[in-house]
């Protein structure tokens, strides 16, 4: 069994994280309810905004 010393263990700075989400009918109603009651600030969750025209052009290029 190979033992790792402190210098070897601390030299790693990457991590791979994989997540799979599944949405059910109840997920959307819960999210809408939380937003309507101002329980969550959705603006903090938005990282980028793209125009619909830009997105449709990109999707057409994928065909």
UniProtKB/Swiss-Prot annotation:
<protein>
    <recommendedName>
        <fullName>Uncharacterized protein YFL041W-A</fullName>
    </recommendedName>
</protein>
């Amino acid at each position: 069994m190979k033992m790792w010393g402190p210098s070897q263990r601390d030299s790693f700075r990457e991590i791979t994280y994989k997540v799979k989400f599944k949405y059910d009918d109840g997920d959307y109603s819960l999210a809408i309810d939380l937003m309507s009651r101002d329980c969550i600030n959705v603006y903090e969750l938005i990282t980028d905004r793209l125009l619909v025209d830009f997105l449709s052009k990109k999707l057409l290029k994928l065909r």
